[in-house]
Regions:
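A charged N-terminal "starter" segment
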Residues: 1-115, 121-135, 183-187, 221, ...
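Hydrophobic, small-residue-rich alpha-helical packing segments that form membrane-like cores
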Residues: 104, 117-119, 123-148, 159-163, ...
């Protein structure tokens, strides 16, 4: 898939006049169109809903855009629930999936009448004790072992290892949990599972759906409860590399439909609503980190230093993740220079790219780092006293809007109990 920026150099320079680099910028048009594609792909299911993972991009402007497109939200903490509430989400618009859940978080989810997804069998009594048992309840499934998509030309395709994951229940634990929940007043039950991350395959969701649909049939027979919802969670990925193929959401939706009709309909369970939580797929490609080249260094390697660092985009440092880079204004120039593109943290893993072939980069060039619309700004941090960058929305009409200002030193010091001692630093 060819990686094309949604900003031109001229557009970036216009934004920079108002918002200095570094900043994350999001494409409203792209996000809206993608949300509509998702809804269309699963329109065959009357109860379908996409629950956008708030952790991927926790900005109220983005959440409100997705709400307008018919999406709900997937929350995992008290603050995500609070953010979603002020954006107008409540009740069945919220999926609450948490683990090792604090009392305050569970109480808030119950107060909002969210769909609560229990991660562990012991959470049944915990939920009843701290909040109460709602009519609608989910349990998270962990099948153990290794999850794969079978054989390919490259060999056995291992996608992930659920058996090593801390999440979810065994089938036996789920069955006992549903029985207990039913006895305590729950009436409608859901199944949730997340078995692999960032899959670049149209087969992942259909394969997962087949597993969960068969599980639903077994659980309903074993317990007599009504399985009304199945949440395929996230895991549908995006092509971070240009040589990767983009997932076809229409093909994915059709694959899930076929499994639905093969397994659930014959079992008399054709009323089951399908939910998804595609945070990365929904917004990932429609965000970018825009930075300026401020230094170059020539020692054993060639380095380009940016005014952004891993505090603005953690994924390359934390996971060794690849993010494509475009030098705005030089899209058509030959990539004949090898660089390490780095930030200024006192950590040697603060590298956006290693041995990357790029056009010649000059001081002052605008560097566009692709695919930061999910798990980008959201994973920002303050190590080394670095400050989180601004967030900008590129509106559908071509204008831009600041939707989160950059942090300031005052923000950094705000929670310290000696702030009065810092007052002279902030006086004009």
């Amino acid at each position: 898939m060819e990686k094309k920026p949604f900003l031109t150099e001229a557009m970036a320079q216009e934004i920079i006049q108002d918002v200095p680099t570094p900043f994350h910028v999001y494409d409203e048009k792209g996000i809206r169109e993608n949300a509509r594609r998702i809804n269309k792909a699963f329109s065959w299911n009357k109860g379908f809903k996409e629950y956008f993972a708030v952790k991927a991009l926790p900005n109220p402007v983005i959440l409100q855009i997705l709400k307008e497109e018919g999406c709900g939200v997937d929350c995992s903490s008290l603050t995500e629930l609070m953010l979603s509430e002020v954006c107008g989400f409540s009740g069945s618009d919220i999926m609450f999936s948490s683990n090792q859940t604090p009392v305050e978080d569970m109480k808030k989810a119950y107060e909002l009448d969210a769909y609560i997804n229990l991660d562990d069998a012991t959470m049944v009594e915990f939920l009843e004790r701290v909040a109460g048992v709602p009519e609608n309840i989910f349990c998270r499934y962990n099948p153990g072992g290794t999850f794969s998509l079978g054989e390919s030309e490259e060999g056995f395709q291992v996608m992930d290892k659920p058996g090593d994951a801390k999440y979810g229940m065994t089938e036996e634990q789920m069955i006992e949990s549903y029985k207990k929940l039913a006895a305590k007043g729950a009436k409608n039950f859901g199944i949730h599972a997340f078995l692999a991350s960032n899959t670049i395959s149209d087969e992942y969701y259909p394969e997962l759906a087949g597993i969960l649909f068969q599980l639903a049939v077994r659980v309903q027979k074993a317990t007599g409860v009504h399985i009304g919802y199945i949440n395929l969670s996230g895991g549908v990925g995006i092509p971070y590399r240009s040589e990767q193929t983009e997932n076809d959401i229409m093909a994915i939706g059709e694959g899930v439909r076929k499994k639905f009709e093969e397994i659930l309909v014959p079992a008399g369970m054709g009323d089951v609503a399908i939910f998804t939580e595609m945070g990365r797929f929904t917004t990932g490609p429609y965000g970018a980190l825009v930075a300026t080249a401020i230094h170059e260094k020539h020692i054993y390697k060639e380095y380009i230093g940016l005014d952004a660092c891993a505090a603005n985009l953690m994924r390359p440092a934390m996971y060794g993740a690849y993010h494509h880079i475009t030098v705005l204004g030089k899209e058509n120039e030959p990539c004949d220079h090898m660089y390490d593109v780095v930030g200024g943290l006192c950590e040697n893993n603060d590298k956006f790219a290693i041995d990357r072939m790029l056009p010649k980069i000059d001081i002052g060039d605008i560097v566009y780092i692709h695919d930061t619309g999910a798990h980008g700004s959201a994973m920002g941090y303050n190590y080394n006293g670095k400050l989180r960058s601004a967030e900008v929305l590129l509106c559908e009409d071509g204008t831009h809007r600041l939707i989160r200002r950059a942090e300031t030193p005052r923000d950094y010091f705000a929670t310290l109990d000696f702030l009065p001692l810092m007052k002279p630093l902030f006086e004009d």
